[in-house]
Amino acid sequence: MARSLKKGPFVADHLLKKIEFLNVKKEKKVITTWSRGSTILPIMIGHTIAVHNGREHLPIFITDQMVGHKLGEFSPTRTFRGHTKSDKKSRRP
């Protein structure tokens, strides 16, 4: 279910404050966050945000095509190791 338009997009307060502070200073620094549910806003474009995936923080460079998506969409939490290859020689006839 989509979020109500009257509420607006969710962005963690601490993350928004850090972004606004860096925009005022015109600095580009990696911002570490655990807030995977925060929505990407246009003021975040050009910043690098390190999003936690459960084990480590993955740096993500924010582009204009990412606006409206969540931060967690760009840091995968599961490792896909590939499907097991079936060995037909070891099978019984």
UniProtKB/Swiss-Prot annotation:
User: May I have one GO cellular component term?
Assistant: chloroplast
Taxonomic classification = Eukaryota, Viridiplantae, Streptophyta, Mesostigmatophyceae, Mesostigmatales
UniProt-listed SUPFAM superfamilies: Ribosomal protein S19
Q: Which compartment or compartments is the protein found in?
A: Plastid, Chloroplast
A Pfam family assignment: Ribosomal_S19
Where is composition skewed (Basic residues) in this entry? 80-93
Give the gene symbol.
rps19
Q: Which organism is it from?
A: Mesostigma viride
Q: Which GO terms describe its molecular function?
A: rRNA binding; structural constituent of ribosome
Swiss-Prot/TrEMBL keywords:
Chloroplast, Plastid, Ribonucleoprotein, Ribosomal protein, RNA-binding, rRNA-binding
Task: Quote the InterPro entries the UniProt record gives.
Answer: Ribosomal_uS19, Ribosomal_uS19_bac-type, Ribosomal_uS19_CS, Ribosomal_uS19_SF
Cited function: Protein S19 forms a complex with S13 that binds strongly to the 16S ribosomal RNA.
Predominant place of localization: plastid
Checking PANTHER family in the record gives: RIBOSOMAL PROTEIN S19P FAMILY MEMBER, SMALL RIBOSOMAL SUBUNIT PROTEIN US19M
The keyword rRNA-binding is assigned to this record? yes
Q: Name one GO biological process term.
A: ribosomal small subunit assembly
The entry assigns this protein to a family as follows: Belongs to the universal ribosomal protein uS19 family.
Please list where the region (Disordered) is annotated.
73-93
Indicate the transmembrane segments per the record.
none
Q: Report what the protein is called.
A: Small ribosomal subunit protein uS19c
